[in-house]
């Protein structure tokens, strides 16, 4: 197979995301982990910080690269010559939303979406939940790559002053 995009906000990247990237990298020649820029969302980490953390956590995957994009994902796919999108699915709610997006992307551009069922060990994980639990002092160390865990705790401490 050729290349695939793995899009998301990745604020921050979790072990669940990393599992999807690893599995996608085993199926595609190239995987472009794409930080989608949403100017209406104020993240814990800015886009450059997220990209840096993604590069660090995917460095062991030689066919994975990191990029960012503002706009329609299918426009980025077209620009990159990529014809596939890979999304991890945690549950039926994810499926309903992602299926609708996949059908729209197919209609707009012909790009196919491939779904990877999330490893059950990570099926409850979301970046939002991890940030919330960490903010209140919960232990999320086994939910994040070590470098991300450290940066998250540092950022929470910075915000507390």
UniProtKB/Swiss-Prot annotation:
Subcellular location: Cytoplasm
A molecular function GO annotation: pantetheine-phosphate adenylyltransferase activity
Cross-referenced PANTHER family: PHOSPHOPANTETHEINE ADENYLYLTRANSFERASE (PTHR21342:SF1)
Signal peptide: none
Protein name: Phosphopantetheine adenylyltransferase
GO cellular component terms given for this protein: cytoplasm
Catalytic activity: (R)-4'-phosphopantetheine + ATP + H(+) = 3'-dephospho-CoA + diphosphate
Enzyme class: transferase
NCBIfam families in alphabetical order: coaD_prev_kdtB (TIGR01510), cyt_tran_rel (TIGR00125)
Cofactor: Mg(2+)
Function (record text): Reversibly transfers an adenylyl group from ATP to 4'-phosphopantetheine, yielding dephospho-CoA (dPCoA) and pyrophosphate.
Family: Belongs to the bacterial CoaD family.
